[in-house]
């Protein structure tokens, strides 16, 4: 029998760092399953999870303050290898009898650490050598406190000028701490450091691969739903598309997809979804044309948050009505992914702050007495894409730019009208077509057009035109937490502008959005 791909696993304890999910993604990239849990995990939860290694992530608090988060009591006495990163190293030091103090000189950004001792964590890793032959590593720091005295049993592993104890180790107990962040790309050898901890020190095998993930998911789906029928709301987005392909591989005709065309999709998107899933893959897809219903509900509504809620609730109503017509369905499938699970858990602690409400089915309506199947709930977005390719979905579908759940409803500023949606659909298609032609689509992280409900004077021939304005936006980002506007060639922008104005009746002006995030968000609403 094949080995369970979850058998070799790493536990990441979250102390509130913005980088915690990045650590998990790096561990998964190494080929090892991991999960993020809150720092105050119980003994029973720890025993049940049974990790081969534990990583203590960073956090915004100070170890020097009373009442700050700490690792669970007895964690370091379990005989399980532990790696503390930044705050994780500091709380390890403090809890084991060392000392942490505020730095006179804070370290934020690039630093060079000198390796001071031999050990498996930094073995054979170097970026530069000193004249004396000592190893130097280029790393990324982000800390205001520092360890000033190591606990008993630890030795100095690395140092910088402003952090004399930049890394430490207790080889007898397999405890390691690094003040820098190996999970970020600025730490050049960060992936190798994490590999050493995960594979060498913790003894994990790299079982977490796309092919094995698909096989495991198919097995789990079959075990979970048996011979029951499953219903999925198919949007055409990456998550729902991969969910559909995975379910279809697992249970075939037991799956029925409902595709709600709300009139707020991209140009020809509805037909493309039907061609891909119904025609090419043989998936049962029911297409519901609900454009008139959505537009009538949105009439006169200007507030973006209200628009999001109306679109989300109307989707549930339409989906609910359609589901009622399908007999003997026991399961509802959703494309929930791991960051959704983490954020949902964070919101229950009361520490999350909603900037925009995120559109999803968002749970089962009371009237739908179905059980939930979420085959992607363990996966990060980059893993979902790899699974999509493994399942045979086209590259352009799997790696298409993000599209908001409410669709063009939040790319039309103010009230949504059919006229506006038709104009925007065509403008957006022209922009993306030209990006593809210039081989720049996959070099930008997200690109789209926005409809501005203001009119501007233009001139065509001898005639004045008083027509609408289209804004185009393209950004580059690693994590969508921050983003810079894409420096697209002027010639490309000129072509896009000329085509939109000449080919679309009703547009007299095109602008390019050069706002970065922060302070602006990527989407306009």
UniProtKB/Swiss-Prot annotation:
Residues 9-207 form the Glutamine amidotransferase type-1 domain. InterPro entries: Class_I_gatase-like (IPR029062), GATASE (IPR017926), GMP_synth_C (IPR001674), GMP_synth_GATase (IPR004739), GMP_synthase (IPR022955), GMPS_ATP_PPase_dom (IPR025777), NAD/GMP_synthase (IPR022310), Rossmann-like_a/b/a_fold (IPR014729). GO terms for cellular component: cytosol. Gene3D superfamilies: 3.30.300.10, 3.40.50.880, HUPs. It catalyses: XMP + L-glutamine + ATP + H2O = GMP + L-glutamate + AMP + diphosphate + 2 H(+). GO terms for molecular function: ATP binding; GMP synthase activity. Its EC number is 6.3.5.2. Pfam families: GATase, GMP_synt_C, NAD_synthase. Transmembrane segments: none annotated. ATP binds at residues 235-241. The keyword GTP-binding does not apply. The active site is at residues 86, 181, 183. The keyword Disulfide bond does not apply. Keywords: ATP-binding, Glutamine amidotransferase, GMP biosynthesis, Ligase, Nucleotide-binding, Purine biosynthesis. Homodimer. PANTHER family: GMP SYNTHASE [GLUTAMINE-HYDROLYZING], GMP SYNTHASE-RELATED. Catalyzes the synthesis of GMP from XMP. This is GMP synthase [glutamine-hydrolyzing]. The lineage of its organism: Bacteria, Pseudomonadati, Pseudomonadota, Gammaproteobacteria, Pseudomonadales.
């Amino acid at each position: 029998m094949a080995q369970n791909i979850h058998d070799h696993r790493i536990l990441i304890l979250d102390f509130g760092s913005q980088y915690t999910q990045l650590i998990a993604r790096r561990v998964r990239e190494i080929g090892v399953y991991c999960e993020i849990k809150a720092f105050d995990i119980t003994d029973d939860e720890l025993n049940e999870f049974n990790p081969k290694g534990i990583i203590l992530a960073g956090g915004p608090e100070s170890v020097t303050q009373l009442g700050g988060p700490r690792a669970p009591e007895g964690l370091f006495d379990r005989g399980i290898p532990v790696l503390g990163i930044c705050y994780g190293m500091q709380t390890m030091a403090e809890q084991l009898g060392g000392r942490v103090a505020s730095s006179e000189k804070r370290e934020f950004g690039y630093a060079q650490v000198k390796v001071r001792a031999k050990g498996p964590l930094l073995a054979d890793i170097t970026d530069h050598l000193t004249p004396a032959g000592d190893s130097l590593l280029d790393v990324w720091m982000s800390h205001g406190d520092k360890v000033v005295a190591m606990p008993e049993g630890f030795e100095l592993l690395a140092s910088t000028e402003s952090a004399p104890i930049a890394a430490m180790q207790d080889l007898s107990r397999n405890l390691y701490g690094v003040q820098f962040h190996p999970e970020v790309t600025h730490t050049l050898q960060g992936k190798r450091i994490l590999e050493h901890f995960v594979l060498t020190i913790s003894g994990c095998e790299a079982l977490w691969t796309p092919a094995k993930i698909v096989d495991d998911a198919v097995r789990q789906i079959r075990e979970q739903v048996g011979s029951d029928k499953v219903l999925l709301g198919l949007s055409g987005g990456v998550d729902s598309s991969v969910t559909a392909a995975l379910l279809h591989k697992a249970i075939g005709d037991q799956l029925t997809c409902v595709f709600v065309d709300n009139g707020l999709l991209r140009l020809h998107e509805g037909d493309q979804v039907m061609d891909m899933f119904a025609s090419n893959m043989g998936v049962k897809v029911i297409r519901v044309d609900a454009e008139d219903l959505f537009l009538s509900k949105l009439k006169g509504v200007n507030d973006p948050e209200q628009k999001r809620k109306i679109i989300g609730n109307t989707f549930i109503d339409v989906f609910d009505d359609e589901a009622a017509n399908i007999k003997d369905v026991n399961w509802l499938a959703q494309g929930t992914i791991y960051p959704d699970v983490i954020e949902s858990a964070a919101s229950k602690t009361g520490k999350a702050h909603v900037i925009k409400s995120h559109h999803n089915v968002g749970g089962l309506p009371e009237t739908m007495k179905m059980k939930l199947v979420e085959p992607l709930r363990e996966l990060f977005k980059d893993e979902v894409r790899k699974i999509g390719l493994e399942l045979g979905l086209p590259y352009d579908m799997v790696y298409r730019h993000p599209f908001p759940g409410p669709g063009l409803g939040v790319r039309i500023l103010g009230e949504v009208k059919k006229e506006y949606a038709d104009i925007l659909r065509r403008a957006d298609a022209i922009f993306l077509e030209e990006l593809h032609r210039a081989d720049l689509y996959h070099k930008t992280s997200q690109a789209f057009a926005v409809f501005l409900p203001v009119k501007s004077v233009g001139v065509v021939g001898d005639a004045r035109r008083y027509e609408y304005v289209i804004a185009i936006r393209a950004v580059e980002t690693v994590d969508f937490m921050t983003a810079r506007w894409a420096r697209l060639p002027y010639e490309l922008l000129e072509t896009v502008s000329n085509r939109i104005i000449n080919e679309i009746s009703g547009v007299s002006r095109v602008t390019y959005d050069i706002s970065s995030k922060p302070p602006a968000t990527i989407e306009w609403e």
